């Protein structure tokens, strides 16, 4: 979604209308649309559709997390590492919830609303103030999530390569 978000904002407004879209112009996958639209419109619609899907998957993940106990932290981890890991996980969950929510509210604030893979989902109310405010939230939360993801990845590498304490095994599907 980060790549898609950055890519779609670089596309010019009012480009030529077509019904075939080569994903990121890489020649790997082509989308066919039943109606002609600009590339910018297509990618915004795709981003919104995937974002709504992610929002509901995150809600399910949060439900799962609340109803299933996670594995215990390793005894080799210090109290500071346990607190840091817990705080990072809470931040990741919060951001995974806030990013699509802010995107949904931003889209409702626009005049276009949200179509989920072509199906009208939520109408827009054309409120520029609401849209602009939640656009800022959406972008800031996205950047913070990217930072937390990098830190989380670095922590996992540290445990795998330096500590060699089995944290990656704990994170995976092993019991």
Residue spans for each PLM region:
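Membrane-embedded alpha-helical bundles that constitute the cytochrome b-like, heme-associated redox core
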Residues: 1-175
